[in-house]
Amino acid sequence: MNEFPVVLVINCGSSSIKFSVLDATHCDVLMAGIADGINSEDAFLSVNGGEPAKLAHHSYEGALKAIAFELEKRNLIDSVALIGHRIAHGGNIFTASAIITDEVIENIRRVSPLAPLHNYANLSGIESAQHLFPGVQQVAVFDTSFHQTMAPEAYLYGLPWKYFEELGVRRYGFHGTSHRYVSQRAHDLLALQEEDSGLVVAHLGNGASICAVRNGQSVDTSMGMTPLEGLMMGTRSGDVDFGAMAWIASETNQTLGDMERVVNKESGLLGISGLSSDLRVLEKAWHEGHERAQLAIKTFVHRIARHIAGHAASLHRLDGIIFTGGIGENSVLIRRLVIEHLAVLGVKLDHEMNSLPNSHGERIISSKDTNVICAVIPTNEEKMIALDAIHLGKVNAPVEFA
């Protein structure tokens, strides 16, 4: 084993590979980057925010080869002791992270029809990493596994039983790695005992979800069988009356596939504003008086507040509301508006703390006389994946969480 082992974290998307290299002691990021445009002529690699370099080979393996070469240039290639893979969907098979074996790969393949765009890409990443890093232990970390502690009444749909029994149609939830990391950090920040605590975590980004965490376990979450359910998002509609979609399809002669495209790619902040799916653009328009941008933000906030309050009903006690994700960590406006909507819970905002930039890191943003503590905790999914890899794998280094 290398004296200074590192963990390579890989997140393969439908056309990209995001990667990070973290030291195995403190899980500090040593390098990070993205290969994008995979399987196209425009494929490129960018490392540490640098200029994109065109990839000679456009496949997942070609992109990983280029990433391995970058590690070699930095004398890190021989230090890779473990590889952690983010896997989009583990179905009801995986309730925790797992060391990758032939059986694990086969089970990932079995549940891949539940998330075909991402899981098959995840499998390509695993297979390519096995070829390029023979003998290096690999670990799969599932975005759905944290939510496998939900009770049937929380994950079942009100559909005929045969669809659950025969097809596995149920709520699985996503962003689990983020919700798990943030809830663990929240117990420290809020001085809570994990075994007797109640949190609602709001992961707000272009994709967004809420999670109720009781005694350290997920008991409810807003996303469902797919990431479409729940909150309104950048381009996703979130909760929508299926009858409305059936009526639109009938009136406009559109197919089910057309409707799926509409609710996934053309809705949400983009759909209402008609301007952008990027909240930063909409916030600027908000201050300029753009009415539909303002309406999009108000609708976004209303859904978030409603889901936070609803998820609190799954807890025995509400100790804290935690904001995370790109929007949750950076948008002073969204946090303020959401907390104002939650006055019914006795939540009060400290405007000065809320206005601090995200560079201030973990912080409490509620006032001292609030009934429920509100906080901002930057997520760190890469660190969570690396920690899981270290805990499951074999690496000769002392590990520190904080």
From Swiss-Prot:
Binding-site list for Mg(2+): 11
Summary of subunit composition and partner proteins: Homodimer.
Chain positions recorded as ATP binding sites: 11, 18, 175, 203-207, 278-280, 326-330
EC number: 2.7.2.15
Protein name: Propionate kinase
SUPFAM superfamilies: Actin-like ATPase domain (SSF53067)
GO biological process, one term: L-threonine catabolic process to propionate
Cross-referenced PANTHER family: ACETATE KINASE, PROPIONATE KINASE
GO cellular component labels: cytosol
The protein's enzyme class: transferase
Cofactor(s) required for function per UniProt: Mg(2+)
Pathway note: Amino-acid degradation; L-threonine degradation via propanoate pathway; propanoate from L-threonine: step 4/4
Site entry: Transition state stabilizer: 175, 236
Sequence positions that bind substrate: 86
Active site, renumbered: 143
Encoding gene, per UniProt annotation: tdcD
Protein purpose: Catalyzes the conversion of propionyl phosphate and ADP to propionate and ATP.
Reactions catalysed, as given in the entry: propanoate + ATP = propanoyl phosphate + ADP
Keywords: ATP-binding, Kinase, Magnesium, Metal-binding, Nucleotide-binding, Transferase
Pfam families tied to this protein: Acetate_kinase
